[in-house]
């Protein structure tokens, strides 16, 4: 269920503060954050935000298409290494 329009999109205050400071000074540095729950706003376009995935920070370059989505959508937390192969023992049991 989407968030109420009267409340507006959720963004952590510390992240929004960093983005606004970067926009004022026209700097483009990587912003490290653990806030996967924050919504991407138009102010963030062009910035690179390193989103934590549980082990490391994944750099995410923000584009126009990402506005309205959450930061966590672009930093997957699980790595799929494939299903197990058939061993000699498992095939001989059949």
Curated annotation (Swiss-Prot):
For this chain, the annotated S-S bridges are none
Naming one, the record's GO cellular component terms include: small ribosomal subunit
GO molecular function terms attached to this record: rRNA binding; structural constituent of ribosome
Q: A biological process (GO) annotation for this entry?
A: ribosomal small subunit assembly
InterPro entries in alphabetical order: Ribosomal_uS19 (IPR002222), Ribosomal_uS19_bac-type (IPR005732), Ribosomal_uS19_CS (IPR020934), Ribosomal_uS19_SF (IPR023575)
Q: Does the keyword Ribosomal protein apply?
A: yes
Entry's Gene3D superfamilies? 30s Ribosomal Protein S19, Chain A
This protein's UniProt keywords = Ribonucleoprotein, Ribosomal protein, RNA-binding, rRNA-binding
Q: Which Pfam families match?
A: Ribosomal_S19
Its annotated function is as follows: Protein S19 forms a complex with S13 that binds strongly to the 16S ribosomal RNA.
Q: Which family does it belong to?
A: Belongs to the universal ribosomal protein uS19 family.
Database matches in NCBIfam families: rpsS_bact (TIGR01050)
Name assigned to this protein: Small ribosomal subunit protein uS19
> Its encoding gene is what?
rpsS
């Amino acid at each position: 269920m989407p968030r109420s329009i009267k409340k507006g999109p959720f963004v952590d205050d510390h992240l929004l503060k960093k983005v606004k400071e970067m926009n004022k000074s026209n700097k483009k540095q990587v912003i490290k954050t653990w806030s996967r729950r924050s919504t991407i706003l138009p102010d963030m376009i062009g910035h690179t935000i390193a989103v934590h995935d549980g082990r490391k920070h994944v750099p995410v370059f923000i584009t126009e298409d990402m506005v309205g989505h959450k930061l966590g959508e672009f930093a997957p937390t699980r790595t799929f290494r494939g299903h197990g192969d058939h061993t000699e023992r498992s095939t001989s049991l059949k």
